[in-house]
Amino acid sequence: MSNKVKSDIEIASKAEILPVTTIAEHLGLDADALELYGKYKAKLSYDTIHSLKDKEPGKLVLVTAINPTPAGEGKSTVTVGLGDALSKKDKKTVIALREPSLGPTMGIKGGATGGGYAQVIPMEDINLHFTGDFHAITAANNALSAFIDNHMQQGNDLDIDGRRIVWKRVVDLNDRALRKVVVGLGGPIQGVPREDGFDITVASEIMAIICLASDLKDLKKRLSEIVIGYNYKKEPITVGEMGYEGALTLLLKDALKPNLVQTLEHTPAIVHGGPFANIAHGCNSVSATSTALRLGEYVVTEAGFGADLGAEKFLDIKVPALGKAPDCVVIVATIRALKMHGGALKTELSEENVDALAKGFTNLQKHTESIQTFGIPYVVAINKFITDSDAEVAKLEALCEEHGIPFSLTEVWEKGGDGGLELADKVIAAVESGEADYKRIYDDAWSIEEKLEAIVTKVYGGIGVELSSKAQKQIVEFKKYGWDRYPICMAKTQYSLSDDPTLLGRPTDFVIHIREFIPKLGAGFVVALTGDVMTMPGLPKKPAALNMDVDENGNAQGLF
């Protein structure tokens, strides 16, 4: 390798990419199973998905992480690299990932298809518009907003209270100026004035529904159950009462189909759906994972941010819908993030600091304990960065050995699948041990308060929950409607185990503050908003978009 570090897009643009029909052949599928979007991208047809339903599922590996730095810790990179390593071990492997959101791509991340020599391609297409799934979800979401405002303009037969509409518009960008807006201005013919707001598309309930629906029939049913707001008697109003579930299903009929692409090393990858894990449930679609499990011997998937967010939601929300629990969990840890948790400044994370690393190790310990609470064996993947010193690597390995934590030093960013062979061996051993004995940390029959308590004490390591007066009133209301039977989806900062993003490491004796609940009945969960978490992010001072361009031949530049 050259001393110059190549960017992700430089590596991806020089890679040999096979026709997606060839990738499908590796899975035993012919061209008729695909709906092509050019040479290198395809959707799997409904006939294909239905034909696989009775096949025995393969083994499932979930990749999660410790609480990350703002730049992320390489969870997607490890997912891809592990998939390629398993392929090299002669395991028929399929990777199942989420689709990237344009918001963070243009904002801070610059892309989300893995990195270095562990990427999913065509990365340029996947990071931008891909097969149009997010645009379809945005259109369906905003069509519903238009239907709501039109209903109020045209007589308001359902007595919708404009002050109590909870459905927001969305756009797949980070745009803080749209968090709170007023619509319907300009006089009687322009609509009924009311306060509104925008979320990012990946926070839309329709995104969550796409990711949890099993088929078109289930999609339509879930869409009909969306609560859009309340009438003047404070009774909930659903999409089904308005009668628009059919139109919304029509807009989403292609977006429900999973997308097939490949890694740099030609491992099949099914990339579909993309809810954030801090403000939604953070997992790719049930349809994608289920299909992958019936096409591969091993499936490697990921859940967003740390194990306190994406993994908890995968295990408590997605697994019941999927009907299959992971056989092994991989927890990605980086030396730079552990140093941050040990008190090192974010501007100094590339400098050697063994003491900060040792102090921050407690964050990793907590995440390993949380995964064990769910009864699933795990392996820690130490995702090696070029800034990691030999002393830091040796210290982290020694700490893992001292505390009986199974680990593997992973170099997939630099070496692709070859850098993850040891990790693959340890994952295979964990899977084949048969030790997985999955159990949820709460039952759906429990009260909302009991579910919150379970998540906070067992996964976050806190001592309890504090409810705002609004949240307390909502619990009474939700019990009346039977909404307390749904799982809880916590909306919480990704940077801390607590709801305070500045409280790093392994904090203790903290409480989680619930400011309000949002019923997402179509998705099948209740969102609990904590702290100051936002459902529409903002851009940083210098967005990643400043470095993006396109050359005269139409080739993208600056995606990373």
UniProtKB/Swiss-Prot annotation:
It comes from the Bacteria. ATP binds at residues 69-76. The keyword Acetylation does not apply. It is an enzyme of class 6 (ligase). GO terms for biological process: tetrahydrofolate interconversion. InterPro entries: Formate_THF_ligase, Formate_THF_ligase_CS, P-loop_NTPase. Keywords: ATP-binding, Ligase, Nucleotide-binding, One-carbon metabolism. Its EC number is 6.3.4.3. GO terms for molecular function: ATP binding; formate-tetrahydrofolate ligase activity. It catalyses: (6S)-5,6,7,8-tetrahydrofolate + formate + ATP = (6R)-10-formyltetrahydrofolate + ADP + phosphate. Pathway: One-carbon metabolism; tetrahydrofolate interconversion. SUPFAM superfamilies: P-loop containing nucleoside triphosphate hydrolases. Belongs to the formate--tetrahydrofolate ligase family. HAMAP family: FTHFS. NCBIfam families: PRK13505.1. This is Formate--tetrahydrofolate ligase. It comes from Listeria monocytogenes serotype 4b (strain CLIP80459).
